[in-house]
């Protein structure tokens, strides 16, 4: 992409309404624009990152054998009355009425809808296990939306649902989702710690939230510092293997880690004092096992091998896709702007032409751009006739992990400069080696294509 042809409305001043770093930088970098309280338009740069994150979520869900689908944003209130949650959910639910005077609602979550789909189409244990998921816009009418996309009213969310014959099968699905989420967050450059949590309005006997440690987090968290040393890494997992998935769950949940809602002071005090930590965290996902709560209420049953009709065991599993942008920025920034991890960066690298209009510099930039594009990478070429300082400031603000700087002086020596946004370290090399270096970096950080 050539910056001269791109829509990137960067702001020099920080908007007064932005209270946290992620909100400030998303506004300044031209990623979002507020349309109403807690509701945002996603501008091209923000949309690219949103789709990169969505792509990683899709890839990891399908790696685990989960089936993508899509449900509507508007639901009938009848299903929610049937489950008993229509009145219980509270004022966060946006209730509407159509022209035929039927009660409808804007989806805050989809347990009822997916259960209705299941009960209409599945009747035999032979069709189990089954896990389906969607990535769709949701709406919760927050009383005080704030912090940009971190606590908006409209949000983009992955929500998945498993249907199993037995509790044991459903708990394996729970463990499988925990493994999937660990892989997903690590690919995004995040350490998201699974913590015992409260089921809230969704309910459930067993639930973990995934939290990213950050000073601006809304949740107070208590944890054993040993958990921050754990990484999933490149290990291979057979998602059908019960023992493997259970072992990962035990590895990542055996140490104390809880939100303030489920904190147990006595258990926390059993952790060696030097390892006790109290911090704040941003919730970026949650997994639930809630047994037969919805299947019993909505009549989602299957016939077993001996002819009995039994309610299925269920769980639901969510990832806040739009919220993740804010969480990543909160975890990865400096005073110049965003520092995107390689896995979710909107463009793989930036190309800065220090002397636009110089024949040699222009030609070298065009060759770099063509070479990177030819091997499937997505560079952002700043070909504007702007001062070098302004170009560097824009690149630092939008946070691309790598920058290739091209100027007449370096080209006389046959070199360009490759700079890491995270460390600030620069290295001179030939244009050909610069392409090889960027290609090698992203060979280890596969990213979905942007838009």
From Swiss-Prot:
- PROSITE patterns hit by this protein: AA_TRNA_LIGASE_II
Enzyme Commission designation: 6.1.1.15
Write the record's keywords in alphabetical order, separated by commas.
Answer: Aminoacyl-tRNA synthetase, ATP-binding, Cytoplasm, Ligase, Nucleotide-binding, Protein biosynthesis
The stretch of residues making up the signal peptide is: none
Q: Which reaction does it catalyse?
A: tRNA(Pro) + L-proline + ATP = L-prolyl-tRNA(Pro) + AMP + diphosphate
Subcellular location, principal: cytoplasm
Query: What is the enzyme's class at the highest EC level?
Result: ligase
Family classification:
Belongs to the class-II aminoacyl-tRNA synthetase family. ProS type 2 subfamily.
Q: What does this protein do?
A: Catalyzes the attachment of proline to tRNA(Pro) in a two-step reaction: proline is first activated by ATP to form Pro-AMP and then transferred to the acceptor end of tRNA(Pro).
Question: What is the annotated quaternary arrangement, including any partners?
Answer: Homodimer.
Name recorded for this polypeptide: Proline--tRNA ligase
Query: Which organism is this protein's natural source?
Result: Ruegeria sp. (strain TM1040)
């Amino acid at each position: 992409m050539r910056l001269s042809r791109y829509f990137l409305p960067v702001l020099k001043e920080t908007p007064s309404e932005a209270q946290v770093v992620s909100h400030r930088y998303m506004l300044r970098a031209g990623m979002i624009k507020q349309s109403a309280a807690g509701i945002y338009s996603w501008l091209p740069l923000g949309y690219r990152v949103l789709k990169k994150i969505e792509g990683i979520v899709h890839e990891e869900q399908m790696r685990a054998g989960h089936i993508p689908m899509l449900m509507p944003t508007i639901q009938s209130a009848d299903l929610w009355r049937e489950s008993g949650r229509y009145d219980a959910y509270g004022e966060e639910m946006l209730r509407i009425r159509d022209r035929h005077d039927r009660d409808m609602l804007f989806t805050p979550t989809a347990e009822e809808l997916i259960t209705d789909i299941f009960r209409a189409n599945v009747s035999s244990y032979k069709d189990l296990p089954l896990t389906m998921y969607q990535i769709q816009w949701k709406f919760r009418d927050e009383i005080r939306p704030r912090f940009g996309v971190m606590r908006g009213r409209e949000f983009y969310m992955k929500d998945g649902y498993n249907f199993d014959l037995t509790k044991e099968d459903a708990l394996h699905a729970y463990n499988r989702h925990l493994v999937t989420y660990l892989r997903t967050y690590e690919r995004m450059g995040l350490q998201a710690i699974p913590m015992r949590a409260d089921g809230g309005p969704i309910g459930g006997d067993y639930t973990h939230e995934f939290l990213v440690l950050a000073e601006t987090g809304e949740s107070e968290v208590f944890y054993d510092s040993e958990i921050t040393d754990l990484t999933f890494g490149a290990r291979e997992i057979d998602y059908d293997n019960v023992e493997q998935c259970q072992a990962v769950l035990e590895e990542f949940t055996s140490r104390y880690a809880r939100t303030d809602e489920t904190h147990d002071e006595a258990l926390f005090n059993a952790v060696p004092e030097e390892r006790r930590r109290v911090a704040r965290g941003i919730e970026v996902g949650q997994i639930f096992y809630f047994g037969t709560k919805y299947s019993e209420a909505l009549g989602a049953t299957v016939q077993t091998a001996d002819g009995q009709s039994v309610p299925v065991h269920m769980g639901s599993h969510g990832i806040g896709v739009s919220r993740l942008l804010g969480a990543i920025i909160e975890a990865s920034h400096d005073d110049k702007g965003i520092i995107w991890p390689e896995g979710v960066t909107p463009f793989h690298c930036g190309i800065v032409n220090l002397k636009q209009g110089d024949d040699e510099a222009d030609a070298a930039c065009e060759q770099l751009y063509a070479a990177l594009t030819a091997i499937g990478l997505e560079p952002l070429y700043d070909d504007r006739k702007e001062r070098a300082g302004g170009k560097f400031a824009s690149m630092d603000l939008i946070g691309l992990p790598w920058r290739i700087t091209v100027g007449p002086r370096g080209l006389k020596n046959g070199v360009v400069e490759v700079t890491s946004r995270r460390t600030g370290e620069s290295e001179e090399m030939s244009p050909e080696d610069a392409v090889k270096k960027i290609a090698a970096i992203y060979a280890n950080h596969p990213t979905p294509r942007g838009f």
